[in-house]
């Protein structure tokens, strides 16, 4: 089966002041040490907001745009940290992520909705592989990037755990996802992750 991807991922490309081309935001762009350490949730939320604002004419008001580039994205990142503010344990579930995301939208005068899937390895509550596939396929086909919380890597050699990233594409049969994380992209085997991640995680999509 063909890869399912958001239609214009290049809208999430930013050139930093030193000339580095990044895909999606990077928490290192924050100014303070605490923000740099803990800001993955607000960055993932910023990716969702930015993409919606730049692909839907009626959602332009979700963020202020001067030149549509790095500086504008930084303004959004800083604002988002005030709505999705990490505590000592970070933003460790969708319940700490979604309310701030929607509150930000309301403050901008736009009513948005969120769909989310908590992934826990507990009997009777753990989503199956098909649940995750269906969730990702549904929202990527609707041209919505998906925020992904990885609480533990399982057998995958991912750069970080207890960490929010953004899913841009999925190959549904192999369950290989294309992920934006700290300005770079890589692939991750979501099927392997679901089967081996001890702490699970969450998926969140923002939509009208």
What are these regions (language model features)?
Residues 1-97:
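Active-site-adjacent structural segments surrounding the nucleophilic cysteine of cysteine proteases
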Residues 2-13, 72-208:
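Conserved active-site-adjacent core of cysteine acyl-enzyme catalytic domains
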């Amino acid at each position: 089966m063909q890869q399912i991807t958001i239609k214009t991922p290049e809208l999430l490309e930013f050139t930093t002041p030193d000339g580095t081309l990044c895909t999606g935001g990077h928490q290192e762009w924050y100014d303070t040490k605490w923000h740099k350490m803990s800001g993955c949730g607000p960055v993932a939320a910023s990716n969702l907001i930015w993409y919606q604002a730049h692909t839907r004419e009626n959602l332009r008001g979700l963020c202020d745009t001067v030149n549509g580039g790095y500086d504008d994205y930084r303004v959004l990142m800083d604002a988002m940290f005030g709505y999705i503010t990490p505590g000592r344990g970070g933003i460790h579930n969708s319940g700490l992520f979604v309310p701030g995301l929607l509150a930000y939208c309301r403050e901008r005068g736009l009513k948005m909705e969120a769909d989310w899937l908590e992934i826990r390895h507990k009997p009777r509550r753990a989503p199956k592989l098909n649940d995750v596939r269906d969730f990702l396929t549904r929202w990527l086909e609707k041209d919505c990037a998906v925020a992904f919380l990885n609480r533990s890597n399982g057998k995958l050699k991912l750069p970080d755990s207890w960490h929010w990233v953004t899913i841009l594409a999925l190959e549904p049969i192999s369950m290989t996802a294309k992920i934006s994380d700290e300005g770079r992209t890589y692939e991750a085997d979501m099927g392997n992750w679901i089967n081996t991640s001890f702490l699970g995680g969450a998926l969140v999509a923002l939509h009208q």
